[in-house]
Amino acid sequence: MTDHTGSRFKRWKKPLTIAFFLLLIVLFTLLARRIGWSEVIQTLGDFKWRTLLIAAGLTLCSFLVYACFDLIGRTYIGQPLRWKQILPVGFISYAFNLNLSAWVGGIAMRYRLYSRLGVSTGNIAKILGLSLATNWFGYMALAGVVFSSGLVTMPPGWKVSTTALQGIGALLVLVSLGYLAACQFSKKRAWSIRGIEINLPSLRMACLQLALGALNWSLMAAVIFTLLPAKLDYPLVLGVLLISAIAGVVTHIPAGLGVLEAVFIGLLQHEASRGSLLAGLIAYRAIYFICPLLIALVMYLGVEAKAKALRVKKTPA
């Protein structure tokens, strides 16, 4: 990309993002007016404890899988950190990342917590980069298979047709395979970006990245599937979640608030009532976003209190 093309892209990126965001607000407002809120309240009240516990268990599994991204990072940087040190950092970072944006959770929180464990700034950046790669290459591999298989049928009138979605899926599969091929066959294994050396992982590590990343997205979909009407198929719910993730990234809204709901209702309102869909998504927000954030906040305050106690202990009288 030339400098002229790059500057033109930057100039148009913000207006296009704002326009997309406004479009989603209009869409969600129109949908909200057509939703039977009495049905939403009734559906929320009708949830069985067994259903909520299953969703909570799947949420815990998802957070543990995401925290394991940093275990790959430990191997990547070659620093002897214990899993008991890494998993809490991954859990806390993910909870803050989901609710307060990647800058707060993915970046700031990881830098603060890992620096307390004696990890250098360069190695923290490598762990962060590998975690992002694990998440999004896993997404591309899974979305590629789901989209290209035709499991998701786009409603009439949508800008992206089912055929176009299948084409996007095929492209994502090719990108995923290209990443694996690069990890196996590339002769150049290292690059320097702003003074930080980035090393291409081994094929084994790359396969583990794709597997864990795809598993986490699958578990997220399983939580939503558990809370939505029973007549919906899991592959369809998974596909819609993967589509909504793209919209969430484009808008940069923390937690994708409103975006997830607009996409799910827009794509599934012909399969189930809008009220039942929104009720399930509200329950999903509470179980997958709010509850883990509260737990992560307590964990983080505990880490800070422990660090403060150690500083006081080391300070001479």
Say what each PLM segment does.
Residues 95, 130-133, 246, 286:
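Transmembrane alpha-helical cores of Major Facilitator Superfamily
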Residues 94-104, 132-144, 148:
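Mid-bilayer segments of alpha-helical transmembrane spans in multi-pass integral membrane proteins
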Residues 113-123, 239-240, 244, 262-277:
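Interfacial segments of multi-pass membrane proteins
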Residues 104-116, 145, 254-269, 282:
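Re-entrant/interfacial helical elements at transmembrane boundaries that shape
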Residues 84-88, 102, 107, 116-133, ...:
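Membrane-interface alpha-helices at helix entry/exit sites of multi-pass transporters
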Residues 1-91, 139, 148-249, 274, ...:
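Predominantly cytoplasmic-facing regulatory/coupling regions of multi-pass membrane proteins
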Residues 34, 81, 99-100, 104, ...:
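Residues at alpha-helix boundaries and short interhelical turns
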